[in-house]
UniProtKB/Swiss-Prot annotation:
It comes from Human herpesvirus 6B (strain Z29). The keyword Nucleotide-binding does not apply. GO terms for cellular component: host cell Golgi apparatus; viral tegument. Pfam families: Herpes_UL7. It is found in: Virion; Virion tegument; Host cytoplasm; Host Golgi apparatus. InterPro entries: Herpes_UL7. This is Cytoplasmic envelopment protein 1. Keywords: Host cytoplasm, Host Golgi apparatus, Virion, Virion tegument. Belongs to the herpesviridae cytoplasmic envelopment protein 1 family. Plays a critical role in cytoplasmic virus egress. Participates in the final step of tegumentation and envelope acquisition within the host cytoplasm. Disulfide bonds: none annotated. It comes from the Viruses.
Amino acid sequence: MKSLKKLKELETSDVFNTLHVRTILKVIKIDKCVSLARHSLVNITVGDDGIWFHLEDGTMINGLEYKTICEKELGFQGFIGIIILDSEDTLQELRLNPFQFKRRLIHMKVDTPEEFMLCGLVFALENLPLKQSTLHKLIARLVLFPVLSPVTKILFNTCDKLVCTLRHIFFNEHASEILHKVPPMIRLYNEMKNTHIEVLELYFNTKRSHNFINLSLESRQLQDSSLQVIQLATQFAQIFYSKNEDTSS
């Protein structure tokens, strides 16, 4: 029985090292109107006393207080996110068709202050221009937090992967402990950007400028579709939360 338990724990660990959750957005529902909202973060800083969130209204809060801020927001229902594999983000498109995408969209049941903070950090790492020193300090702080649940684990691993990816593509860090966490697809794209290898350019089928890389998935188009991630996520969220209301009423 013990060996079986260890095997299951190992399998769970492998799954969460392979998958990560991206495009974490707030679900807002007022009356019957459902919408997705971005986090109100404009910057993060890291000090000896913790991780600090700078908000759009000019206030600065400890990241562990973000739970209170979110729960006070009118109509806040929680978060949604998209589960993806390393190979599915090419930095040009998300290699999921609309049917696959629908099955990857999840309602995130986050409860603890640490989980709320990690959701905010995923957004910040995807969307904000963070300093190299901030990225270094961030991981040093995150490893101090207890990883006690599957949700915390996948959020932590996502943050870790995003930090390493940012350090590699924007700050040219190539240490082995960084590179092995950067998705191979993104490492290839970065090589293409730096060396302009025509074969890789054909593989990625890109016509955009190589000088601009964005980790946000919101504006990515889905495979074989003209729809963007944010458009389809909004459609599915409206259907899902409306159905839940009908079921509960």
